[in-house]
Regions:
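Conserved nucleotide-sugar donor-binding catalytic segment
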Residues: 92, 114, 134-236
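Membrane-interface aromatic/basic loop that binds lipid-linked glycans or pyrophosphate carriers
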Residues: 245, 264-318
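A conserved acidic beta->alpha catalytic loop
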Residues: 18, 25, 33-42, 61-63, ...
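Conserved donor NDP-sugar-binding/catalytic core segment of glycosyltransferases
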Residues: 94-135
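Glycine-rich, basic loop-to-helix element that forms the pyrophosphate-binding segment
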Residues: 59-77, 90, 98
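Acidic helix N-cap motif at the loop->helix transition within catalytic regions
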Residues: 13, 38-46, 90, 94
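Short, well-formed alpha-helical segments that are part of the catalytic scaffolds
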Residues: 8-21
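Short aromatic/hydrophobic "clamp" motif used to bind/position activated sugar donors
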Residues: 82
Length: 318
């Protein structure tokens, strides 16, 4: 269990206690701090005496990337399965037991992803729902969906990072070790999205339709900062380009609609016009996209109920 932290002293105790309260007890805890300036280190040092804690690593200089801490924690880990338990989140006591049992049941699965309740800074449950499960997902037997990894990329991760919170995932370390390109760890905003794409290439993906994770929402996040500057969109374009080069069977209509969704996103960004123009040019050069893709995306979204063969992001989801 890797707990990477940066300036979340106010949530650390709840995070660590929610790990110690797990009904599955065969685990080690790796505590990481990325040069916090609050009271984090004293809290981490207090918990370092717990027999479950195998490592406490405190950086003297901030890395500038949350994903660099992921890589560090994974390199220190000794277990078969890895849970990156973000320091501001929490979990239900049955989370690990459920996740590990699923990975044992499906030995070809590279990771399993469980649902989340969204909570605020005080721990109150919010109505926000990032899972967005429909009858398609909830009608599956045993509250689970089991997918071929490449199909999961094509129909799900090509459109967006459905794996919206690392704290909701347990993955197989052996599958991580098969990844050859770890450029995701040097990214600032969307490295987690690329990470799950690379993990999905290593085996099957299992979704568990139970909300056993608690995902804390903040007013300011790294992702939102990236959207404000446009840098997050640049990283997203890079990721979609990677997918299109690695999967040959995406299909022309799916590509067109996906490119159109980028045009829509850029149009709606609250950034200066010159940044929008720069992003539009970058989109065209990177993905060979053009403005007509935007109108195809809008048409498909408006009329897919009438013409079921039209592809949209939501309809394409497995």
């Amino acid at each position: 269990v890797i707990i990477p932290n940066y300036n979340y002293a106010r949530f650390l105790r709840q995070r660590i206690e929610s790990v110690l309260a797990q009904t599955y007890t065969d685990y080690e805890i790796i505590l990481l701090d990325d040069a916090s300036t609050d009271d984090s280190t004293s809290i981490l040092k207090h918990y370092s005496a717990n027999p479950h804690v195998s490592h406490l690593e405190i950086n003297s200089v901030n890395t500038g990337s949350p994903f660099a801490q992921w890589q560090k924690g994974i390199s220190l880990s000794r277990g078969k399965y890895i849970w990156i338990a973000e320091s501001d989140d929490a979990a239900e006591p049955s989370f690990l037991k459920k996740a590990v049992s699923v990975l044992k049941q499906y030995p070809d699965a590279s990771f399993c992803f469980l649902g989340s309740h969204c909570i605020d800074g005080e721990g109150n449950q919010l109505t926000t729902d990032f899972d967005r499960w429909t009858s398609k997902q909830l009608s599956r037997s045993h509250n689970m969906g089991v997918f071929d990894g490449e199909d999961y990329i094509k129909h799900n991760l090509y459109w967006r990072n459905y794996i919206y919170n690392a704290s909701g995932v347990v993955f197989r370390k052996q599958c991580f070790e098969q990844i050859k390109d770890l450029s995701c760890f040097s990214m600032r905003y969307s490295g987690d999205w690329l990470f799950w794409i690379e993990m999905a290439k290593q085996g099957m993906v299992v979704e568990v339709y139970e909300k056993l994770n608690n995902f804390r929402l903040h007013n300011v996040s790294t992702t939102k900062k990236g959207q404000k500057t446009g840098d997050g969109v640049r990283e997203d374009i890079y990721i979609v380009n990677r997918i299109e080069h690695s999967l040959v069977n995406i299909g022309r209509q799916r590509k067109t609609v996906r490119h159109g969704s980028f045009y829509k996103e850029i149009k709606r960004l609250k950034v200066p016009t010159e940044i929008k123009e720069e992003l539009t040019l970058h989109l065209a050069s990177s993905l060979k996209a053009n403005s007509s893709d935007y109108y195809v995306e809008r048409f498909n979204k408006s009329f897919s109920w009438l013409m079921p063969w039209l592809i949209t992001r939501d309809k394409d989801r497995l």
